[in-house]
Design a protein with these regions (language model features):
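Electropositive, glycine- and tryptophan-enriched low-complexity nucleic-acid-binding patches
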Residues: 55-59, 112-193
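Short, glycine/acidic-rich beta->alpha junctions
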Residues: 36, 71, 117, 200-204, ...
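An internal, acidic/charged active-site-proximal segment
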Residues: 153-258
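Active-site-proximal, Lys/Arg-enriched surface segment
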Residues: 60-145, 149
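Electropositive nucleic-acid engagement tracts
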Residues: 16-22, 28, 32-100, 218-220, ...
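Basic, low-complexity segments
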Residues: 1-16
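A short, surface-exposed helix-loop junction/capping segment
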Residues: 20-27, 163-164, 189
Length: 258
């Protein structure tokens, strides 16, 4: 088993410029696979025993210069060959947190807990077939409270951006847009899958569905029970203003379909 893991690590970490980066990448991967709930550097280093140099692992994760996109691309190529995917599945996962030190942690809804709670949220892209699936691309969702350009910015959270290593140019992006960005990235790796599957968190966004159509991608997505639709030829109009109260908003001429 260890030999197989070493072969896998050698393949996905091959783009790293230095031998020590490849070595600590493999050790970090082994640490993630060890028993134990906490996957931060210090407890993983303790579980790894002689191989677990806490300082070296922390340097690899936080400051060593390597591009994660190169690792994700090699993982995607390997999984594409193994899975032979028929669909891309998008989902988001909550990582429950007790404190507020982690990057992008905020009180937000997550299906992991089934409620609004303190957590990070990650958006993931999975290659999927009838037999198997694997996550090959992912993004950490940055809430508006962490974006200094947002009117909903929280000064305390914005002040933690530097300590958390969040680049200045990174701001709030809706989850459905992160999903479209990941489609574009996987296509740049040469992976073309013509079907997307996602739940209502993505399907309710008309811009997401339009983005899929612009990319010539078929889709099966969930929508909420309150979603309405109009015939393609329908055009909204503004009723006459009676001179009192707020001006009327645009309405569609026919009853919506549900």
């Amino acid at each position: 088993m260890r030999g197989e893991l070493e072969d896998f690590a050698a393949e996905v970490f091959e783009p790293f410029a230095r031998n020590d980066q490849r070595r600590w990448g493999q050790v970090y991967l082994r640490g993630l696979l060890t028993d134990g709930q906490r996957k931060s550097v210090e407890p993983m280093a303790a579980r790894l025993g002689e191989d677990g140099n806490r300082q070296a692992l922390a340097h690899f994760v936080t400051t060593s210069p390597w591009d994660p996109a190169h690792v994700r691309a090699r993982l995607a190529w390997r999984m594409e060959a193994a899975i032979r995917p028929r669909a891309l599945i998008f989902d988001d996962t909550g990582f429950l947190k007790d404190g507020n030190a982690s990057a992008c942690v905020s009180r937000q809804y997550t299906g992991t807990a089934g409620k609004v709670t303190n957590c990070q949220a990650g958006v993931s892209l999975h290659l999927a077939s009838d037999a198997a699936s694997a996550a090959v691309d992912w993004r950490l969702f940055l809430p508006e409270s962490w974006d200094p350009a947002s009117p909903k910015a929280d000064p305390a959270k914005v002040a933690r951006r530097t300590k958390c290593g969040i680049p200045e140019e990174v701001g709030h992006v809706e989850k459905w847009q992160l999903a479209l960005d990941m489609i574009d990235e996987t296509r740049s790796w040469g992976i073309e899958v013509p079907l997307v599957v996602a739940d209502g968190g993505y399907g309710d966004a008309a811009a997401f569905r339009l983005g899929l159509e612009e990319r010539a991608v078929d889709y099966v997505v969930g929508i909420s029970t309150t979603t309405t639709a109009q015939p393609e030829a329908a055009r909204p109009h503004i009723p006459p203003y009676g001179g009192r109260g707020p001006r009327p908003q645009p309405v569609n001429p026919s009853r919506p379909m549900r």
